Amino acid sequence: MPDYKSVVVSTTDKKKNKKKKKENAALAIVKGLIPWKGDSVGEIIRKIVFLVSIVALCVAVLIIIDKYMFEPERQRNEYQSSILQLGNHEPTAEEIAELPEKAINTEYAPFYAINNDFVGWLSIKGINVNYPVVQGKNNTDYLEKDFYGNYSKNGTIFADYENEFKNTGETSANTILYGHNLRTENFFAEITEYRRVDLDKSLEFLKKHPVIEFNTLYEKAKYKIFSVMLINTREEYGDVFNYPAILNFANRDEFNYFTSECLDRSEFFTGVDMKYGDKFLTLSTCEFEVGLYDMRIVVVARKVRDGESDSFTDEQIKSFKRNPDTKQCRTIRELYYYGKEWSGRYWNPAWIEGFKKDSSFKTESSD
């Protein structure tokens, strides 16, 4: 007859032995890490140095995490809070008196009083784009400097240093605004939503936010988006559209070149018409999604004319569509278009007043 009692005792002993081995192993690890009774002086010093190193490493990791994850977030919140407070501040007579001659938008006087580089205010309804715009002596002044002149990796939204903002309200034909889109999700972070790899999703975003407002000290204006582009800036990738160099048009040919290139390269068509003499607003920010260096997302909008509606009708928004074949640099064509050559233009030449249709247009051009 089996001795069940001995079997139970044997099993219990095995469990106790396993538990004891685990405890001994844990104790051995602890003894190996911290000074213990019976350790030699050299062993104690070694363990102390090791523990200090571990603590220093942990502190360094926490500092790095704070610097790159939490500090930018704090900077964003503090910056936006200060800008909001400044915007809610009623301008004083002294601040208004400091404005340039013929400035009419006195609500911006507090911003100009703090920073004379202030040239306007940019906003897009429904998204986190609602910021002051500055203009430096060059296009690097505000890359890592906030509105108050303090160091910030977020920088500030700034106008091209060669853009003109006259006290008559006149501006350059093409006003270019640059901004970062870092992980803090401010400035131009949401501008990247206009051009994601998921273009259908971006089209829906465009339909919800098709109008940009940019007010200077001398006028208030709205702009209708007609082009959303992915732009290459490196010659090694092939075709480069040097849009930052185009601030004015010497003649109709230069105007036609700029507007037609914007339509050729646009991911979407919104049907906005253009004519020589129109003014444009261009938003430019870095692009990181396609996997190439120095790519840009560029959004171009045409200024609303006198007497024109400053919004799109529901019917117009429904007609927004994707470009069947976007003009891109060689490397993008190789990566995303199976190496196929650009097939030609699918936009309506009537969108540019006086533009002549030629063989580059496809028969399926948009209405």
Residue ranges and their predicted role:
Residues 2-13, 18-99:
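N-terminal membrane-targeting segments
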Residues 59-367:
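Solvent-exposed, non-transmembrane regions of membrane-associated and secreted proteins
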